[in-house]
Design a protein with these regions (language model features):
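A general "terminal functional-core" signal
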Residues: 1-145
Length: 145
């Protein structure tokens, strides 16, 4: 995403990732937040809470495109972070709520997830989509306004 949007002042990219994860040379986002290996739910979510609202308020996007990767999961082979299933769900619900309470539409894509058991990775992706749909349901259909 960062490589595709590099140099575009009308697009803001925020990336939270382990500082030593793959790939070693990363395209630069507008805001890159490199976390220590093994960062767990609470530290990850407080970092997100410290940055996302400010980014949304100051940049003022028309739409939020959310890459809902599951590579921050503790059992991921490449992500190097330590989020639990609940932590991923809390992250996804939080991102949706921050966008929607500002009246912003949000679209999401699956991304990341490199476990040894494909079924478990797929389940994490499915839980991510369900968490976002459940949070989004609290805000109703903006197209009807």
């Amino acid at each position: 995403t960062a490589a595709l949007t590099a140099g575009r002042e009308d697009i803001f990219t925020l990336s939270m990732h382990a500082e030593k994860n793959f790939p070693v040379r990363k395209a630069r986002s507008t805001l890159d937040i490199a976390l220590p290996d093994g960062t767990g739910d609470d530290a990850y979510l407080s970092t997100l809470e410290a940055h996302l609202p400010r980014v949304l308020d100051e940049f003022g996007p028309d739409v939020v495109l959310y890459q809902a990767g599951v590579d921050p999961h503790a059992n991921d082979k490449l992500g190097r972070l330590a989020l639990s299933d609940e932590g991923l769900q809390r992250r996804d619900s939080y991102v949706v709520s921050e966008a929607r309470r500002r009246g912003l539409p949000i679209a999401s894509a699956l991304g990341g997830g490199y476990g040894t058991e494909p079924r478990l990775v797929a389940e994490r992706h499915a839980r991510s989509m369900i968490a976002m749909a459940q949070e989004n349901a609290h805000y109703g259909d903006a197209s009807q306004k």
